[in-house]
Amino acid sequence: ASTLAVIRQDINGRKPAPKTVAVLADPVFSANDERVKTSVGANGRSPLQPATPNEVDILALTRAAREIGATFQRLPYTRKEAEGILKLVPAAEEMPAFDFTANRATATNPQLSQYRIVHFATHGILNSVHPELSGVVLSLVDEKGTPQNGFLRLNDIFNLNLPAELVVLSACETGLGQDVKGEGLVGLTRGFMYAGAPRVLVSLWSVDDAGTSELMSRFYKKMLQENLKPAAALRAAQIEMLQDTRWTEPYYWAAFTLQGEWR
């Protein structure tokens, strides 16, 4: 309750962002990815360049992945998910960042503060023992296949200026964290709220790629076309999937929860 009170005080009188949504999706995780060979004309209109490689951060990602047994395979439905969202928004009000442009430089650029919604469709890492090793995984190589720092760590997130009305983390277990005495739950949700977002949509367990794409499509249609608030839009989308014989199992839709301001 106290956190919610602080959030409401912080956003009171805040001017709405002028644009609708920034989407970072379908990053390139490996030099073996076919997009490295065909990077000329790669999709994504972000003008930002990849971050300068940082050996310490790359090692941190390696350690974080090793500790939880994570591997970073391409998530094919994240592109479908992102493209579906962007179709709902006028081109002048969106920022698509796909492939190599779905990188750390894009995620940390002040330009993101111009958008009401920031959507990450990629892998997430949650390390409950060492929360400082938690983060969002973005493009790990550049167009030439050269390794680069693509790990948006929890400490990076805390240092962002991201006053978006909503941050969506369409990744696995992004809503979990470590309970630290006197500090509460330390995780990605808290990081993005500290950065300025009053609402963060996250998952509580490993999610199905296709099911998540379907849920996000319905969620954004409810929010952007029917003008429902995020909490109401999520509930409506989940009920629709429950009633759809293709997606009835809660595994496909129940993992996602909205943290923070529900109004």
For each feature predicted by the language model, list its residue ranges.
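Catalytic cores of enzymes
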Residues: 1-263
